A protein has these predicted regions:
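Secondary-structure edge/capping motif, primarily at the C-terminal ends of alpha-helices
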Residues: 268-275, 302-312, 341, 438, ...
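A structural signal for short hydrophobic beta-strand segments in well-ordered beta-sheet cores
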Residues: 140-141
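Amphipathic, small/basic residue-rich leader segments at the start of a protein or domain
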Residues: 1-90, 110, 417-472, 481, ...
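A short, Trp-centered hydrophobic/proline-enriched beta-strand micro-motif
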Residues: 55, 117-126
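A short core secondary-structure module
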Residues: 153-197
Length: 560
């Protein structure tokens, strides 16, 4: 199965219709497993049969990973049924991407062999005392003779109890600084019970099926060969490797909004109020149209950013935090608005709508898991003046391959990912040229509004001083970074519309007008209503896809 469409279709068929109450990999099974704070065993077995973890292994090592955007799209088939199941499997990417980025040939082969055999690799980076500040981590690896001795605590490790190996961030220099930490890749059987105490599992409100465990290590000897990359490069490696995951994990999570929309439609199209379908009530139609638009916005930005990792990998340090910040926020808000439409049905834990309350809980960690949205703005700020300055001085159209339905891309060069973009961002740079394109007449005023907003953002960025761009940046400065993410999303939507095949829904001006209207409201922090004709077109497309069992995302591919 080399073709992504074939693989995605095969996985959908293996997992079956999520609405089938007797399907052991369906919504009912996912909700029942969630009540037990686990994932459905039958669904786990299907993913093992499919060899899902091969999607995270580069083709050069025997896996299927050659396109990050394809990996994301396939994983949406898992996330849409059970986000916890999706995250538990995607957690292997958190660990393995560090191995692909900095590991020796032998370490890469070992990691690939594990994953291709359905083994698990846990990622042990964060510590509760330091949150997103991994440079402050205290878990230590001290050199003793020809080996290392590990000491410290890691309290929140996903699926530690099922791990065959771990990637650990450890302090190898007691002095603070950028070279104070290293990464370790070690087999789980080195965790001798005499020196390793397993900590109680953390219980969570959302993603309850993801088993969060911890360990307290005291003077554990490990061989020097467990070092992953050069000593002292642990934080640098993570900063480069996690560009993939900070982009990919929120992008996979658009499937949560797809399911929330699907459940809301199932409820409102069957329920009658005031002599008509509840779905026909104006407030309900508006909410459905806006949520559908938000889903397309999120996928436009995340697909463009994922492809940019192939085409212009230096932009990953910008696009990854931008995607995490905007997509996580939009998804959470959209699901909450749909909950108001569901009314008392949204918190039911039984019946065919029970998966909705699970989605409401599971979407929240998208905003703070792995890295918090606030930390994403902090990551963007130091690069903002350079990005805005270059976009203003040297605007250029973005490559079509960022947006088109089909694009030929080279395999990602993960070791080549960089810490900074050097001011290069093809999405931002394209906003200075979009008014020269053949735009739909009805959409041009909205495009002009976004271009004016970006010009104003560039002017504000030029006035920023280095001391304003630190972790203690004032709220107005942080808002500039938030506005930058909105501009990137607008550029992505414009590119998707421009390159869409003639006759395709994404080539129509209505969805572009809807997207730019929603984004303008986000930038001003004042929601703007969709024009009536635009709202009607969005609802019509949404209902048609619902009738034909198609994805609500950019691909519109068939779902089981």
């Amino acid at each position: 199965m080399t073709d992504i469409a074939t693989r995605a279709d095969h996985l959908e068929k293996l997992l079956g219709s999520p609405w089938d109450a007797d399907n052991p990999a369906g919504f009912a099974a996912a909700v029942a497993a969630d009540e037990r704070e686990e994932t459905a065993p039958a669904a786990e077995a299907v993913l093992d049969e499919f060899g899902l973890l091969a999607e995270f292994v580069p083709r050069a090592l025997g896996g299927r990973l050659d396109r990050i955007d394809h990996m994301i799209e396939l994983m949406r088939s898992v996330h849409r049924r059970d986000p916890a199941l999706g995250l538990a499997r995607a957690g292997q990417l958190l660990a393995s991407v560090n191995v692909w980025t900095a590991g020796s040939p032998e370490q890469r082969r070992d990691a690939a062999e594990l994953l291709l055999g359905n083994g698990r690799i846990a990622c042990a980076f964060h510590e509760l005392a330091h949150g997103n500040d991994i440079a402050g981590n205290e878990f230590a690896a001290r050199r003793v003779g020809s080996g290392l001795r590990l000491h410290g605590r890691k309290e929140s490790i996903a699926n530690l109890d099922r791990a065959d190996a771990l990637v650990i961030l450890a302090r190898t220099d007691p002095a603070d600084g950028p070279r104070a930490h290293s990464q370790l890749f070690l087999p789980a059987d080195l965790l001798a019970p005499e020196q390793v105490r397993r900590l109680p599992r953390f219980r969570s409100v959302g993603m309850r099926g993801v088993r969060l465990g911890g360990m307290e290590v005291a003077d554990l000897p490990v061989p020097d060969g467990v070092l992953l990359g050069a000593p002292g490069t642990g934080v640098e490696t993570a900063s480069r490797a996690f560009q993939v995951t900070r982009l990919a994990l929120p992008a996979m999570s658009t499937a949560l909004l797809d399911t929330a929309l699907r459940v809301t439609l199932r409820h409102t199209r069957r329920r009658r109020l005031y002599g008509r379908e509840a779905a026909a009530i104006p407030m309900v139609r508006t909410t459905l149209a806006e949520a559908f638009t938000d889903l397309l916005i999120c996928e436009a930005l995340s697909r463009s950013a994922a492809r940019a990792l192939h085409l212009c990998p230096e932009s990953g340090s910008v696009h990854a935090p931008a995607v995490k910040y905007l997509v996580a926020g939009v998804l959470t808000d959209a699901v909450q608005r749909l909950a108001t439409v569901m009314g008392s049905e949204f918190y039911r834990r039984d019946g065919e709508h029970a998966v909705f309350q699970k989605i409401v809980r599971d979407v929240r960690p998208v905003g703070f898991g792995h890295i918090a949205r606030a930390a994403c703005l902090s990551a963007l700020l130091p690069q903002l003046p350079g990005l805005l300055g270059r976009a203003r001085r040297a605007p250029a159209p973005a490559p079509d391959a960022l947006f088109t339905t089909e694009a030929e891309l080279a395999e990602p060069d993960l070791p080549g990912l960089r810490l900074v973009a050097g001011g290069r961002d093809p999405l931002a740079g394209s906003l200075g040229t979009v008014l020269d394109e053949d735009l739909p007449t009805a959409a041009r005023p909205l495009v002009e509004e976004h271009v004016r907003g970006f010009v104003a953002l560039c002017e504000a960025g030029a006035a920023l001083r280095p001391r304003e761009l630190s972790i203690t940046a004032e709220v107005p400065v942080r808002e500039l970074a938030a506005r930058y993410t909105v501009s990137l999303a607008a550029a992505a939507c414009l590119g998707v519309r421009r390159t869409a095949p003639a006759g395709d829904f994404l080539a129509r001006p209505e969805w572009l007008r809807a997207a730019l209207t929603r984004l303008a409201g986000m930038e001003r922090a004042i929601p703007t209503d969709l024009p009536p004709g635009v709202e009607d077109a969005m609802v019509e497309e949404l209902l048609d896809r619902d009738d034909h069992g198609l994805s609500f995302g950019l691909t519109g591919r068939p779902y089981a």
